[in-house]
Each structure stands twice: as C-alpha cells, then as structure tokens.
C-alpha cells in the first residue's frame, strides 16, 4: 500500500483550537493523508456551543500554575513567536501587554514568565492605578481567533486532512466508523462532559460574555484582575476589532446576551482605558458584535492522558479542559498528546 492510499487511521474528534492544533502537528510529521477530523462544528461555523471562535485569544497570566500549565504556556509562547515571525498571515502578532491586579497575583506564574517572556517588567507601585497592588508589562501575543482557526483549517485541507461534520453520541463511534483506526484523539472540550464513553463529571462551563468593538487605534492588551470582576481589552490582529470583556461565570449555561452585561463591560473597559472610546465612555462605543461562549473548564485542570476507546484496544488520547487557555496553552497540550500517541502510530 502506498503512502497516498493508506487508510485514515488517525482520528481526531473536535475541530476547536486544540483539535486543529493537534492535526497540524501530526500533519507536519507527514501524516495528513491518514488523518480524519470528526466534528459537529468547523471554523466556518458560529455557535455558542463552538467556543474557539469567540475567544479574545491572547497570552496573559490567566492560566494555572501547576507544572504542566507552566510548561504548556512556555512551549506555546515560543510557538507563537515562531508563527508571528514566519507566518504573519496566520493572524498572530507580537503585542504589548499591561496586566494589573487588585489582589495577590500567582507568584509561581510570574517567576516562570520572568525566565522567557520578552520585555517582562514589574510596574513600580507608585505607577499602579486605583486599588491595584501589583502589575507588570511584557511583550506577548494577540491572536485573531476566527482567522487563525480558518488558517489552520484551510492549511490542513490543502495538506490532505479529511474533515467530517458529524455529532457523535459515543466515542466508540469513531472506531465503528473507522475500523482501521490506530489512535483516537478526544479534543471535544466542553462536550467531554456529555460524550458517551467519556462523560467526565469534572468538566463544566465557565460562561463568558464579550463585546467586539471598532477601535483601530488600540494596539495594547490591557487586563485588570479585579476583586469582583476581570476586565480585559484585547485587540485582534488584521483589523479584527477589539474584544472587550468580560465575565467568568462557572457552571452557567445561559446562552442569552443581556444588555445590562454589555453596558457593564463597556463601563469597566472604558474606565480601564479611557482612550478606548475616545474619552466618551460607553456611549462612544461602536459595537460590531456581542458574543456569549462557554469556556471548557475542568476541576483539577486540563486532561492530557492516554486511555483506550471503551470496548476496544484502540488507544484514546484525551486532550481537553483548558478553560480559557486553549490558545495560550494549546500548542503545548497538543504536543503532549501527540507524544503520547506516537508509539501507537506507524510512521513508515
């Protein structure tokens, strides 16, 4: 059997940022003609159930401080640096970050950042605004989430990856549909809580609400980790607007956009950056879109683990539960999942 007509024995379930990144890593190993991605949604779709396109998508201190989370961040930071330099068309660029806290920050994260994040600098206490007790500046990244997803999607199709739009009720359907499968990757995000054969009770939604506004003069990411709420301003590269947020509401499945929440976001973001709406406050906002999405959170952190498809001997690699860090930790997570799978994949 030639390389061109080998069976599609590598199955990835899910086409969010984690699933697509996993497929890209495998494709770079020359495995694209053997990859099938099964997903209810792909990057041209928009649904509250499909989280990845709604993300602010930047690199900040939101992620956890366990050893894996710190390592995944570092790996992904260097990956984004490479893409920003070599593939500007992917929708990733270097950007200034200013991050502030009204409470004690994660010192393990700060120590880790100080070893690799460019231009990292603690803001002097005298320069901190309001009730803030700590802040730092750094050079990190901005990602135009929908553009980046579409970039990966088109790249993978051109490389020979097959996409099948389908909603699975049980993970074993991957093997029933593709009996030649040598490995299955479970990159289903929030759906891991409901997918038969997985049904992870530790997975839960963290509701987010963001407002996309027109503000081409804004180039810096600014984040306030407040005592009562988190406020963030995240420009999207390639004239993609500016994401204003937000909310972190664990366990909340509400899909509705509430006008009072939009107003609250605009008030907080304009207070954090008065020049955002040219000093006019919420009344000066030029709204492009309002969005609600559900971050795929998990008690105990993300799951990157080798398992088997129930009732079979086919290896199953879980890679989900990144919550709001699917972009900034995603490449590291996907790389780990591929490393778990490689011994099960015949490369010749």
UniProtKB/Swiss-Prot annotation:
Cofactor: FAD
Keywords, ordered alphabetically: FAD, Flavoprotein, Oxidoreductase, Peroxisome
UniProt-annotated binding residues for anthranilate: 232, 295
GO biological process: D-alanine metabolic process; D-amino acid catabolic process; D-amino acid metabolic process; D-valine metabolic process; nitrogen utilization
InterPro entries attached to this UniProt entry: DAO, FAD-dep_OxRdtase
Protein name: D-amino-acid oxidase
The protein's Enzyme Commission number: 1.4.3.3
Compartments, as annotated in UniProt: Peroxisome
Name of the top EC class for this enzyme: oxidoreductase
Catalysed conversion reaction: a D-alpha-amino acid + O2 + H2O = a 2-oxocarboxylate + H2O2 + NH4(+); D-serine + O2 + H2O = 3-hydroxypyruvate + H2O2 + NH4(+); D-alanine + O2 + H2O = pyruvate + H2O2 + NH4(+); D-arginine + O2 + H2O = 5-guanidino-2-oxopentanoate + H2O2 + NH4(+)
GO molecular function list: D-amino-acid oxidase activity; FAD binding; glycine oxidase activity
Binding-site residues, FAD: 15, 18, 40, 52, 56, 58, 295, 323, 326-328
Keyword Magnesium carried by entry: no
Binding site for (R)-lactate: 232, 295
Gene: dao1
Species of provenance: Schizosaccharomyces pombe (strain 972 / ATCC 24843) (Fission yeast)
Record's function text: Catalyzes the oxidative deamination of D-amino acids with broad substrate specificity. Enables the organism to utilize D-amino acids as a source of nutrients.
């Amino acid at each position: 059997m030639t390389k061109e007509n080998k069976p599609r024995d590598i199955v990835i379930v899910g086409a969010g940022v984690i699933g697509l990144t996993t497929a890209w890593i495998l494709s770079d190993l020359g495995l694209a003609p053997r990859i099938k991605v099964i997903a209810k949604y792909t990057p041209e779709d928009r649904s509250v159930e499909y989280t990845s396109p709604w993300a602010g998508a930047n690199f900040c201190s939101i992620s956890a401080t366990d050893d894996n989370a710190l390592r995944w961040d570092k790996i992904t930071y260097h990956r984004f640096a490479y893409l920003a330099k070599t593939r500007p068309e992917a929708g990733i660029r270097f950007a200034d970050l200013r991050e502030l806290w009204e409470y004690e920050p994660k010192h393990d994260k700060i120590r880790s950042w100080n070893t690799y994040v460019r231009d990292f600098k603690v803001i002097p206490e005298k320069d901190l605004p309001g009730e803030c007790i700590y802040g730092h500046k750094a050079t990190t990244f901005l990602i135009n989430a929908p553009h980046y997803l579409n970039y990966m999607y088109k790249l993978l199709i051109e490389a020979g990856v097959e996409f099948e739009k389908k909603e699975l009720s049980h993970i074993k359907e991957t093997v029933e549909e593709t009996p030649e499968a040598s490995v299955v990757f479970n990159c289903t995000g929030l759906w891991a809580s409901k997918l038969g054969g997985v049904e992870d009770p530790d997975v839960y939604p963290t509701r987010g609400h963001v407002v996309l506004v027109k503000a081409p003069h804004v180039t810096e990411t600014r984040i306030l980790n407040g005592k009562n709420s988190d406020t963030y301003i995240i420009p999207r590269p390639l004239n993609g607007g500016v994401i204003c947020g937000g909310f972190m509401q664990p366990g909340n499945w509400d899909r509705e956009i509430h006008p009072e929440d939009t107003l609250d976001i605009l008030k907080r973001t304009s207070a954090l950056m008065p020049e955002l709406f040219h000093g006019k406050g919420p009344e000066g906002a030029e709204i492009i879109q309002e969005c609600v999405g559900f971050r795929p959170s998990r008690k105990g952190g993300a799951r990157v683990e080798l398992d088997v498809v129930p009732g079979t001997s086919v290896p199953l690699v879980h890679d989900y539960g990144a919550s709001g860090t699917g972009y900034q930790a995603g490449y590291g997570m996907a790389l780990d999942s591929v490393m778990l799978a490689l011994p099960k994949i015949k490369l010749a």
